[in-house]
Amino acid sequence: MRCYAVFDTNVLISSLLTKRTDTATARVIDAIASGDIVPLYNQKIIDEYNEVLHRGKFSFSEERIQKILLMIRQFGLAVNPSPTGEILVDMDDLVFYEIVMEKRDDDAYLITGNIRHFPKRDFIVTPSEMMEILYRDSSGQERIARQFCLPDGHP
């Protein structure tokens, strides 16, 4: 089973900043590589990721930045969103919201550390909440949330 999800930039930053592999932000990124999460993106999101991850205050290596961007493009799905007309606290976040709305028929999620920047919806989740959706407990037993995830082989 796989879930579609849009990753807010802050989740990528947190995953690259952490030294621990057991954090929710690190685990949601690992879920891309394992095929449990299919990232949704468009060029505007890739450009934002690239710009923010290159900011000097983070000091991420070019190799780490390119690796995560390649993983998103390689394992992800490009989406051309329709305008929603939604007004958000931070309008720079609108592209993430519009992409998740474009794929809501496929039960897509938006994963963010800034829940308050978005409307309160059950598909806008923190990295920890996404891990609860994917996994039953800390032993790593997979929980298949059929109403939220896609069967294997679904594009």
Can you describe what each PLM-predicted range is?
Residues 90-109:
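Acidic, metal-associated active-site segment
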Residues 58-59:
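Membrane interface segments of multi-pass transport proteins and intramembrane proteases
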Residues 105-109, 113-155:
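Acidic, PIN/NYN-like endoribonuclease modules and their adjacent C-terminal/linker elements
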Residues 86-92, 115-116:
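Acidic, metal-coordinating catalytic cores used for nucleic-acid/nucleotide bond scission
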Residues 43-46, 64-88:
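Acidic catalytic patch
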Residues 6-7, 24-54:
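PIN/NYN-family metal-dependent endoribonuclease catalytic core
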Residues 11-12, 45, 116-117:
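Alpha-helix capping/helix-boundary segments
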Residues 1-20:
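Metal-dependent nucleic-acid phosphoesterase active-site entry motif
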